[in-house]
UniProtKB/Swiss-Prot annotation:
Designated name of the protein: Probable ABC transporter permease protein BRA0749/BS1330_II0742
Record bears the keyword Oxidoreductase: no
Domain ABC transmembrane type-1: 65-279
Subunit structure, interactors included: The complex is composed of two ATP-binding proteins (BRA0745), two transmembrane proteins (BRA0749) and a solute-binding protein (BRA0748).
Subcellular localization(s) per the UniProt record: Cell inner membrane
Gene Ontology biological process terms, A to Z: transmembrane transport
Signal peptide start and end residues: none
Record keyword Phosphoprotein present: no
Length: 289
């Protein structure tokens, strides 16, 4: 009996610490989200979920919710599509492979805020590097307002999001590729398998657990990503690039609606929890089958 209960006693301090660090803020958020709150965070009367009702009644929140889904799917999906071939190339034995790996990983080591500042400068409509390059190549005659136009601002931010997510995803896939025995490729080559057949029958099936890890971690990371959107456009022009996290920031620190901002936080937490649980169950069942 003592041997059975000992592990629980050993992890009890960590569980208590996790409860204080994680669950107490969530409980406090729920308390704020279900009460009227002034700008100074003072709770008033219980409002019976009026903050949630007010959110879903506004077009700004619904647009931010939809845009968050597009942002997350596009960035995570784009990063996966780019990272797999990059990881396969970097896993090959060629001269300068170590240097190439360092170059690919460098953007991951740079602050995301600084990266967003550099891209904001590069995409400047008047003196940005991208417009200058396109002018030099003779592809455009007039400057394009990349971040000042609703039609181009969000797609460019998605592109930047993909580029800054690729290094982390590539690192995960490199770890997966290094665990695949070379004997499998040698045996398939002797059987006359092409590179595409090797990828389809060997590489990708054995890489699936790492793909699942990348999807879950990147979804959480991208879903909550604040610097790229905020630094580049602050959700503009005219809230056309707002996602949930920037909409939350505006509600809390610009409009002083702390109750609605807390409600947004709880909705975001619920979305991530539901996604993570469902995806892990689906991936586990597919691996077992």
């Amino acid at each position: 009996m003592q041997n059975r209960t000992l592990p629980y006693f050993l992890i009890l301090p960590s569980l208590l610490l996790a409860a204080v660090v994680i669950f107490w803020p969530v409980v406090h958020l729920f308390e704020i989200a279900t009460h009227d709150v002034n700008r100074f965070g003072q709770l008033r009367e219980f409002n019976d979920g009026a903050n949630f009702t007010a959110l879903f009644a506004t077009a700004e929140f619904m647009n931010a919710l939809w845009r968050t889904a597009v942002w997350t799917v596009a960035v995570v999906g784009g990063a996966l599509v780019l990272s797999i071939p990059v990881a396969i190339i970097l896993n090959m034995d060629f001269y300068g492979r170590s240097v190439a790996r360092v170059i690919i990983m460098l953007p991951w080591a740079v602050s995301l805020t600084m990266t967003a500042i550099v891209w904001r400068w590069a995409l400047n409509g008047e003196s940005g590097m991208l417009n200058s390059a396109l002018h030099g190549l003779g592809l455009i005659d007039t400057n394009i307002q990349w971040l000042a136009s609703a039609a181009t601002a969000f797609p460019m931010q998605i592109l930047v999001g993909i580029l800054v997510t690729v290094p982390f995803t590539t690192t995960i896939f490199l770890g997966g590729l290094s665990s695949i025995p070379d004997d499998l490729y040698e045996a398939s080559s002797l059987e006359g398998a092409s590179l595409w057949q090797q990828f389809r029958e060997i590489t990708f099936p054995l890489l699936k657990p790492f793909v699942n890890i990348a999807i879950v971690l990147n979804t959480i990371y991208v879903f909550n990503s604040f610097p790229i959107i905020w630094v580049m456009t602050q959700g503009g022009p005219a809230n056309s690039t707002d996602i949930l996290v920037t909409h939350l920031y505006k509600l809390a620190f610009r409009l002083g609606k702390l109750g609605e901002a807390s409600a947004v936080s709880l909705i975001m937490l619920a979305i991530l929890l539901v996604f993570t649980v469902i995806y892990i169950r689906i991936s586990t069942r597919s691996e077992q089958s």
